[in-house]
Amino acid sequence: MTATKQHKKVILVGDGAVGSAYAYALVNQGIGQELGIIDINKDRTQGDAEDLSHALAFTFPKKIYSAEYSDAHDADLVVLTAGLPQKPGETRLELVEKNLRINQQIVTEIVNSGFNGIFLVAANPVDVLTYSTWKFSGFPKERVIGSGTSLDSARFRQALAEKIGIDARSVHAYIMGEHGDSEFAVWSHANVAGVKLYDWLQDNRDIDEQGLVDLFVSVRDAAYSIINKKGATYYGIGVALARITKAIFDDENAVLPLSVYQAGQYEGVEDVFIGQPAIIGAHGIVRPVNIPLSDAELQKMQASAKQLKDIIDDAFANPEIAAGVKN
């Protein structure tokens, strides 16, 4: 894919709640010119393609269709949302055994089509499945990207914005680490319109320290709350994936919190994909943005990475999984 290519094509693998929400966001925002949808349920993909096409007269021209893996050969971006859903009370990491096998099959099919673009992974546990997509594809790490903590960071900014009465676009704050239970807030660099959050709160006592702790917990556990109430989360992640797609297709060099490969950017954190800010453009990850972490934050990053690394090592100790490795 090049930054000058005018016709941009997405292949979406997984037409469940998240995949459908992402497809709808692409149509609404006019991102890309072609969208092929792959799922084991062909009736579903055909129905979604037809339904989405009926919105085009109100939005932007686009070719939308039920696709086969062979259609990925000339795609610019393959988005992976396929996998078994997270059940109430189930952690994202408990999904790993089941979804790794699904991921291996899908990635193999996509690569065999001749695909040579960028993988964007959203299936959970996303950090583990981004790693496995990299291993199974043999692609450069820059062209395998996970949605990471993009949604978590958006939730964090929105929660802070609501608490202090400021537009979320003027609140700059990141969640880093695993997209899941071991994620953490980078309080040391959170700011409101360039003013450090702690300094802002000295002059505007909208929330105390315990309130900040409670706010983070609500952000971390937001998915569980939503799943318990409606069965799944999909609108937020659908829009987050559309935002990442736009940054790639428009060669924005935007800084977004994504699941990216760790090669020692942070002491003690290596050979995992994990959430941190990164510059993203037409060719994938330009480079990670290594925010200086406080000692406490670095310890949380290391602990989060270790948890992911232990799960990855256990999974790839399975000969059937290891047999598919290309990287």
From Swiss-Prot:
GO biological process: glycolytic process; lactate metabolic process
One Gene Ontology CC term in the entry: cytoplasm
Catalytic activity: (S)-lactate + NAD(+) = pyruvate + NADH + H(+)
Coiled-coil features, chain-numbered ranges: none
Assembly description: Homotetramer.
Binding site for substrate: 86, 92, 124-127, 152-155, 233
Inhibition and activation profile: Allosterically activated by fructose 1,6-bisphosphate (FBP).
Transmembrane segments: none
UniProt-annotated binding residues for NAD(+): 18, 39, 44, 69, 83-84, 122-124, 147
Primary role: Catalyzes the conversion of lactate to pyruvate.
InterPro entries in the record: L-lactate/malate_DH, L-lactate_DH, L-lactate_DH_AS, Lactate/malate_DH_C, Lactate/malate_DH_N, Lactate_DH/Glyco_Ohase_4_C, NAD(P)-bd_dom_sf
Keywords, in A-Z order: Allosteric enzyme, Cytoplasm, NAD, Oxidoreductase, Phosphoprotein
Enzyme class: oxidoreductase
PANTHER family registered for this protein in UniProt: L-2-HYDROXYCARBOXYLATE DEHYDROGENASE (NAD(P)(+)) (PTHR43128), L-LACTATE DEHYDROGENASE (PTHR43128:SF16)
UniProt protein name: L-lactate dehydrogenase
Family: Belongs to the LDH/MDH superfamily. LDH family.
SUPFAM superfamilies from the UniProt entry: LDH C-terminal domain-like, NAD(P)-binding Rossmann-fold domains
Residues annotated as the enzyme's active site: 179
Pathway where this protein functions: Fermentation; pyruvate fermentation to lactate; (S)-lactate from pyruvate: step 1/1
This enzyme's EC code(s): 1.1.1.27
UniProt binding sites for beta-D-fructose 1,6-bisphosphate: 157, 172
